[in-house]
Amino acid sequence: MVVLVSSGSAIAGKEVLGDVNIEDASKRRQVFSAVGQPRMMRHYYSIFHDYGMRCAQVLATKRDFSPGIHRENMINCYESLLSEGIIPIANEDDAVSVTMSMFSDNDELASLVAELIKADALIILSDTDGLYTGHPEDDESEKLNKVTVDENVEKYVQESGKGEGEGRGGMESKIKIAKGTAAKNITTYIANGKRKNVILDIVAGKPVGTKFTA
């Protein structure tokens, strides 16, 4: 059983609307996300439909993961979808999320979902083949195949900037989330989402990406 956590609604909405007259950045994000979410889901629906698969949209805020009725309702939702063979596609409900209580990024959301459904593994897809000891393009840089939660690998992180509408997470965030999730006995991987068959290779136990364990 698989759950896909995907961002992209804000940038999808920005591509549709272009420049808007809304000065407040938070309100712009809400508008971009509200416009872009159905566009993104239409794209996913078409892809899954081509393979004879069904998918569903599951939007969440941090409140949904707090102990209580909201969390129980979220668990019921995921369990029901998965029992029917439907692939849940999770994303933060950016249109209604309060800025001060937003997820740091979708990596955090993915970690919370993994814990919620008691996942066997969490695969975080990036644009690099995993965590390196330096810049991935440097000849002297080496990929770390396996990392434990007590290793100081944060020192290898390179800074990177992101524009408006793009995802909030970088490698530093991914390491933090990967370690935190692995500490809960959920094996976590950071791998290249552009690599062919990357998920299948990880599931098959091939040395793909960087594996985080407790």
Locations of regions flagged by a protein language model:
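C-terminal catalytic "cap/lid" subdomain
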Residues: M1-A214
